[in-house]
Amino acid sequence: MVEERFVNAAAPAGKGMPVVFPSVQGKNLNKVSKTVPDDFTTQHLIAIVAFQQWHQRNVDQTIELLEKNAFGEQFEIIEIPVIQKATRFRQIRLDALMRAAIRDHRIRNRTITVYLDKNEFMTSLDIEDDASIHWFVIHRSANTILLRGEGVITPKDLERITTATDS
């Protein structure tokens, strides 16, 4: 059932869901250091978290739907490739490969790669596995998770996002 994909972070205690998105540091593909979500305070943030290279298609579909419905005007939208911490050489190599594949400055700017303990990050957000993308709507100043979901965002999700951020 689609309804089960959503967890409102303000749900009653006992659901086990985190309320605050953890601060993570990374660099966008334009080589600018960013701290997510702390550096995004002008608008609510939609963060799309991907764990596998093949998730890119789902990330692209999600962002396309958000932009087609003018969510880019109301929200900061970023994608966060989460990669297990590796050697500096491997990080440089992966970043270079991603930059070579993505030429669009706007897409490079919103893609913030983080190298960290992937399991620790997933545990902090109560993500059971890395089989699909996860998305989070994060309050612009409190870093609280207003809404979250798994998989490609749907038109029904857009309604939920609008409702969750109307207050």
Residue ranges and their predicted role:
Residues D38-Q61, I77:
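Short active-site neighborhood of thiol/selenol oxidoreductases, capturing the structured segment around
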Residues T35-P37, H134-W135:
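Short, surface-exposed beta-strand/loop micro-motifs that present aromatic residues
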